[in-house]
Amino acid sequence: MLSRVSVFKPASRGFSVLSSLKITEHTSAKHTEKPEHAPKCQNLSDAQAAFLDRVIRVDQAGELGADYIYAGQYFVLAHRYPHLKPVLKHIWDQEIHHHNTFNNLQLKRRVRPSLLTPLWKAGAFAMGAGTALISPEAAMACTEAVETVIGGHYNGQLRNLANQFNLERTDGTKGPSEEIKSLTSTIQQFRDDELEHLDTAIKHDSYMAVPYTVITEGIKTICRVAIWSAERI
């Protein structure tokens, strides 16, 4: 997830697309030539393009929020509870990487960021630091709640990407474009990371937080409202 300037201002993220070359060797060398041009997909409809913009806008806002939540937790807990420092750092580093990735996707597609970005920064840091000040278990309950909602959010996006982007290609076949494949792969990986964070929170006694239900259900509600708002504003 990369470098950071300070815990108050988490860093932005990077994104790369790799291609691979498979070489097969036989007793007598044979070379398979690649076609000069891969089949092109039809242009996205206005609705499909708008959906992608919403995906990138809300995911960038969400990962920014997660970056700041874990910055707040790390700031409060890392020195008070040294045994939690590597756990928190691992989670935060992954969120920094997620944040950087969607920052770059946002720039690449020229997607307008959420107008509520200053609110996401302040609110997320306050949520992370505030729950950490209550107790380590409350911080883990915060993580459990956030990652439960985000995991479900990413699953919904993956279903829509699978169902709405079966595009016609110039060679007569159908399927997602390389851009959609790449975005799908990114979201799948990030979804898995978030669920790993959820498991980590449970292993570190999130259920021992007091008051557990108030913290988790309150934060889940805040996250759902934030997702709805970031998609639209």
From Swiss-Prot:
InterPro entries the UniProt entry points to: Ferritin-like_SF, Ubq_synth_Coq7
Presequence boundaries: 1-15
Membrane topology of this protein: Peripheral membrane protein
Cofactor note: Binds 2 iron ions per subunit.
Enzyme type, top EC level: oxidoreductase
BP terms from Gene Ontology: ubiquinone biosynthetic process
Subcellular location: Mitochondrion inner membrane
EC number(s) stated in the UniProt entry for this protein: 1.14.99.60, 1.14.13.253
Pfam families linked to this entry: COQ7
Pathway: Cofactor biosynthesis; ubiquinone biosynthesis
Family: Belongs to the COQ7 family.
Descriptive protein name: 5-demethoxyubiquinone hydroxylase, mitochondrial
Species of the source: Saccharomyces cerevisiae (strain ATCC 204508 / S288c) (Baker's yeast)
Lineage: Eukaryota, Fungi, Dikarya, Ascomycota, Saccharomycotina
Gene, per the UniProt record: CAT5
